Amino acid sequence: MRSFLSLMVFIFVFASCLEQGPSVGTPMMPSSDKKEMYPQTNVGEILKGYRTPEVVDVLWDTTFNVTPGLDYYQFQLLTYEMEKLDTYLLRVDPSKGLELKVGVSKQTTPYVWHKQVLTRMAADMSTASNPVYAMVNGDFCDNRKPIRPRGPVHSEGEILAQGYSQDPDYKHQGLSYLGVTFDGQMTIGPTENYESAKTTLKECTGGGVILIKDYEIQGGLVVWNKDRDPRTAVGYTSDNIVWVLAVDGRHKGTEGMTYVEMASVFHGLGCKDAVNLDGGGSTEMVVRDPYSGKIMICNWPSDPTDGDGGVERERPTTWAVVKK
């Protein structure tokens, strides 16, 4: 009964936010303040468990099936440092006929890059027979003219960019790659492995700090960055289940996650590897409502930083969930 009630609240809020088309979602709140009701989801139970030491409580959670093989989760987590975090997760099972695909603007070529907001890019990528079911932002971006992603970009087997545009002022960028091989396997590796791997990668973007490698939380994450910020990251298990994370930050009530906390979440989910992507005002997750068919912005983007956020930032690359 509790799960049914939670689902009905989720559907009502989700649908009401979609009446005006693509829009920014406000964090959904529980219908009751009875703490003992939560967590209600299996993933919430995992995140509250011993495998995720940086999360001490799940204050609220819910889940919704977007399409077979794709589940959406939303949580309010309480961290070891007593920070409340609005957190969003996608669970993608490629064995159910889904795949992760890199999205770019229609105007982008290997020589000229363009940026686009996610709701527009998702609409442009969608067809009647194969809509984009979900999308998150991709790699970091070098905003100097002409703009370009920090790392390599492969889309549907075409190499749009290779190599890395690194900057000593942004040492946490241009450190890795996230890819999908031609046989559908997820892969994450450091920059030095890209050249030998690139011919095997159907989809690929660059990435930042590697959070998990071979099931181990990587050392030195505190050295890289102790700050709280909005975050986007991707991890996967040994059986190729993909977890996509977005966390709100830079506004009252949810300041953002640290690298250590992100790594702890992916470790709790049993991920073999996980990597950080672009964050800050770039962090965004959109999901297609299965009832209305409209795209919903699930999180609360932090731009503009001098206000209360809620504005999409244009990005050169994204990761989309579509049918194979």
Predicted regions and their residues:
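Structural recognition of the beta-strand scaffold that forms the well-ordered cores
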Residues: Y133-N137, Y177-G179, T187-G189, A233-G235, ...
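Solvent-exposed loop/turn segments at secondary-structure junctions
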Residues: K96-G97, D139-R144, Y194-E195, G249-K252, ...
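Active-site-adjacent helix-turn-beta-strand microarchitecture at beta-sheet edges
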Residues: N137, C141-V223
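Positively charged n-region of N-terminal signal peptides that target proteins for export
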Residues: M1-F4
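Conserved, well-ordered active-site substructure
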Residues: P146-S165, G220-Y236, I241-C271, S282-K324
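Conserved beta-alpha junction segments in alpha/beta enzyme cores
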Residues: Q76-T79, L85, L89, G206-D239
